[in-house]
Amino acid sequence: MKRSVLPLVGTAFQQGKMKEAIEQIQDTDLAEIARGERYYFSAQAGACAEAVKNYLTSEDLMLRLSADMLYAFANLTLGNAREAQMAREDVRNCLQKSLEEDVTDETKAACIFACYLSSIFLHIEPEKGIPPLETCINHLPEGQRLFAVSVLAHGMYLKKEYAKAQGVVQTAMLLSDQVYPIPFIYLHCIAAMCQINQKDQEGAIRSVTRAWELAHADQLMEPFIEYHGLLQGVLEVCLRKSEPETYKKLVDGIIAFSRGWMKIHNPQMNTMVTDLLTPLEFSIAMLACRDWTNQEIAEHLGLSVNTVKHYVSAILEKLHLDAITPAP
């Protein structure tokens, strides 16, 4: 069997059948990586790190890159910034090696994809000199290619190219021959991020609902944990009242992940993303920064205007601010 990076990401398994899909992988090393993916995407960071750590020094680049990415992101949640950064640096070393040696286009594409993922995911610009991801994305298998499209679209989102990013992810899903649950969850979430920034609340809610329909049977909660802040309250609208226990689990994951994320993002970008706010407060602050009125925020989140005012006052007090300034 030809190995590829992140095998579970590239598997079109039926909803609720993720474990069975892993059991069908005959390559024992790929199966172990897939188990690590299962742990990661179901928000079991400790189990993920344990499952993949033996592959961090593998001679097989597909196994090593997979382990690096999973280990880096799992350690964000675990609060181990040093371990996460070391895994990110190894991805860069693998890419450099692939550019210097005669490797297949598929291997080079996997290295470039891993580099972009480990940077854009943290809102860090990829290093100069790295080949553009779009020039090699066609060398990835379909499922991994769809996941790479989500990374490209995330980069567009960070440049505030919301309509373009939304078009890219929706087109990618339309053109896919099969439903790949993990990439599709990310693509739907990015569509929602773009829609809410264009004040298309109904569209954003539909996108998150579709993502959750793909995720809930296998408890694939990690994408929602990662994108919570950028979803700007849509997750609260979809789950806070209808599935309170699930939302509580997500909140616990959001707090742990965001603190680890900031440990790498803030020093690298010389910016300070705060960890003083609760997830709901952060969502309200994000909306206020984008010039939403208290009335609009209240209607979006299903709260009273007075409740929103109370939250805004608490946010200002925690951040020692006089007012929330709209984002440029």
Residue locations for each model-derived region?
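Tandem amphipathic alpha-helical repeat scaffolds
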Residues: 2-14, 30-44, 65-81, 107-124, ...
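Helix-turn-helix repeat elements of alpha-solenoid scaffolds
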Residues: 3-25, 37-54, 76-95, 119-133, ...
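Solenoid-like repeat scaffolds
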Residues: 22-29, 53-64, 89-106, 131-145, ...
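Glycine-rich, flexible loop segments associated with nucleotide phosphate handling
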Residues: 106-110, 273-277, 326-328
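Linker/hinge segments immediately adjacent to helix-turn-helix/homeobox DNA-binding domains
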Residues: 116-117, 144-184, 188-279, 295, ...
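Recognition helix of helix-turn-helix DNA-binding domains
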Residues: 273, 291-328
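Pre-recognition alpha-helix immediately N-terminal to the DNA-recognition helix
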Residues: 282-283
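Short, amphipathic alpha-helical "recognition" segments used to contact nucleic acids or chromatin
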Residues: 286-290
